Amino acid sequence: MSYVPIVIEPTSRGERAYDIYSRLLKERIIFVCSTVEDHMANLIVAQLLFLEAENPKKDIYMYINSPGGVVTAGLAIYDTMQYIKPKVATLCIGQACSMGSLLLCGGEKGMRYSLPHSRIMIHQPSGGYKGQATDIEIHAQETLKIKRLLNELYSKHTEQELKHIEKSMERDNFMSPEEAKKFGLVDNIMSSRDAMALLAK
């Protein structure tokens, strides 16, 4: 089990301890920092909904360092990002691969960032199935539907032609921050917090 740092803050009633992620949540910062799967997605969705309820007009900041994961779990986070009222700024720290890259480019237009030495990767969905031939065919058709859906979402957020997206996602496609910016996955490359604050003005 990984160690989570504890932050202790003074209050009028003494001291209060927070785990580091809860403390950052107070600043409207959410971390997507592991494989995207159902349990993790439920936690991220809950945090997004909580921050909307707390202040629907104040921006949310999502920091992404993820290798990707389960498509349906990622789409649950993505749909919630689009559903809530606050703008969601996204920032890639380390990597945003597979579903992680969709969450990155699904942030508010003009508020999608990458740190200078991060990497971003897009590709088509994959899966393996076993069972009766008819069931395998059903799952294969569903995978193709998901592939088309993801292509359409990337096309929407990058403003690239659908055919170009389809070609770009045929295999693992790794990009530097500069390449990701040119592709339309991010809007700016940040080397310091001051640069982000300057762009926000």
Swiss-Prot record:
Cleaves peptides in various proteins in a process that requires ATP hydrolysis. Has a chymotrypsin-like activity. Plays a major role in the degradation of misfolded proteins. GO terms for molecular function: ATP-dependent peptidase activity; ATPase binding; serine-type endopeptidase activity. The active site is at S98 (nucleophile), H123. GO terms for biological process: protein quality control for misfolded or incompletely synthesized proteins. It catalyses: Hydrolysis of proteins to small peptides in the presence of ATP and magnesium. alpha-casein is the usual test substrate. In the absence of ATP, only oligopeptides shorter than five residues are hydrolyzed (such as succinyl-Leu-Tyr-|-NHMec, and Leu-Tyr-Leu-|-Tyr-Trp, in which cleavage of the -Tyr-|-Leu- and -Tyr-|-Trp bonds also occurs). It comes from the Bacteria. Fourteen ClpP subunits assemble into 2 heptameric rings which stack back to back to give a disk-like structure with a central cavity, resembling the structure of eukaryotic proteasomes. Keywords: Cytoplasm, Hydrolase, Protease, Serine protease. One of its GO terms (cellular component) is cytoplasm. The keyword Cytoplasm applies. Belongs to the peptidase S14 family. It comes from Rickettsia conorii (strain ATCC VR-613 / Malish 7). This is ATP-dependent Clp protease proteolytic subunit. Its EC number is 3.4.21.92. Its main location: cytoplasm.
